C-alpha cells in the first residue's frame, strides 16, 4: 500500500464536528508524549502534517488524517499528563471515550507505547478496553532508536507481560526516525482495511 495523498481533514472536539462515516478509520491512542503524531507523520510520509511537540499534552482534539481519500488515521488526545488538572484530564478522557464509543466506521484501535518504559495503569486500562471491545489489540512500541539493540527484546517482553500479550504478531517495535518496521505496519494496515473491523458482529 502506498499513500500518495494525505491531509488533515478535520480537527474535532465535539462529536458534531466529526467528518462523515464514509471512510474506514484506524485510531491511535496512547499517553501524552509517546510519539503518536510522529508515528502518523512517518506512516503518511509527511514530516509536519501531524503536529508534534516535546511538551506533553499537545494533542487535545481528535485529529482526522485523510489518506488517498480511501481511509483515515485518527490521532486521539494523549492521556496521563501529570501536570494537567483533574478537570482537564476528565475532559480529555470524555473526548477519547466519545470517539471510541460512537464511531461506526472504526476498523481498529492501536495502542502506542514508548518502548523505553513499562506500560502505565492507564495503558493497561486502555488496552483492556480495546480487547474487550472486540478489536485485535495491536501495539506500536515507538522510539526504538532511543534504546540499544541489546535492550529491545527485554523491553518488548516487559510490555507483552504487562499487557498480557501472548501473540508476538500483535506488537511492532517502531522508529519514526529511521522508519524501522514501517513496511510491516503498512502491510498490517492494508490487511485491516481489506478485511474490515476486528470486531465480531
Swiss-Prot record:
One of its GO terms (molecular function) is GTP binding. Signal peptide: none annotated. The keyword GTP-binding applies. Residues 22-195 form the EngB-type G domain. InterPro entries: G_ENGB_dom, GTP-bd, GTP-bd_ribosome_bio_YsxC, P-loop_NTPase. Keywords: Cell cycle, Cell division, GTP-binding, Magnesium, Metal-binding, Nucleotide-binding, Septation. GO terms for cellular component: cytosol. Disulfide bonds: none annotated. GO terms for biological process: division septum assembly. Mg(2+) binds at residues 37, 59. Its cofactor is Mg(2+). GTP binds at residues 30-37, 57-61, 75-78, 142-145, 174-176. CDD domains: YihA_EngB. Belongs to the TRAFAC class TrmE-Era-EngA-EngB-Septin-like GTPase superfamily. EngB GTPase family. PANTHER family: ENGB-TYPE G DOMAIN-CONTAINING PROTEIN (PTHR11649:SF13), MSS1/TRME-RELATED GTP-BINDING PROTEIN (PTHR11649). Necessary for normal cell division and for the maintenance of normal septation. This is Probable GTP-binding protein EngB.
Amino acid at each position: 500500500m502506498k499513500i500518495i495523498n494525505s491531509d488533515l481533514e478535520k480537527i474535532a472536539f465535539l462529536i458534531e464536528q466529526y467528518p462523515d462515516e464514509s471512510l474506514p478509520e484506524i485510531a491511535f491512542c496512547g499517553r501524552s508524549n509517546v510519539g503518536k503524531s510522529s508515528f502518523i507523520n512517518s506512516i503518511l510520509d509527511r514530516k509536519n502534517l501531524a503536529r508534534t511537540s516535546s511538551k506533553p499534552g499537545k494533542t487535545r482534539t481528535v485529529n482526522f488524517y485523510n489518506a488517498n481519500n480511501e481511509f483515515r488515521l485518527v490521532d486521539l488526545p494523549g492521556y496521563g499528563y501529570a501536570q494537567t488538572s483533574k478537570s482537564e484530564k476528565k475532559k480529555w478522557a470524555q473526548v477519547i471515550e466519545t470517539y471510541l464509543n460512537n464511531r461506526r466506521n472504526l476498523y481498529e484501535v492501536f495502542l502506542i507505547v514508548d518502548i523505553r518504559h513499562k506500560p502505565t495503569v492507564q495503558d493497561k486500562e486502555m488496552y483492556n478496553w480495546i480487547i474487550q471491545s472486540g478489536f485485535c489489540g495491536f501495539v506500536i512500541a515507538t522510539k526504538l532508536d532511543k534504546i540499544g539493540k541489546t535492550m529491545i527484546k527485554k523491553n518488548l517482553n516487559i510490555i507483552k507481560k504487562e499487557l498480557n500479550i501472548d501473540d508476538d504478531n500483535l506488537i511492532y517495535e517502531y522508529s519514526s526516525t529511521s522508519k524501522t518496521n514501517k513496511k510491516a505496519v503498512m502491510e498490517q494496515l492494508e490487511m485491516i482495511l481489506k478485511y474490515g473491523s476486528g470486531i465480531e458482529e
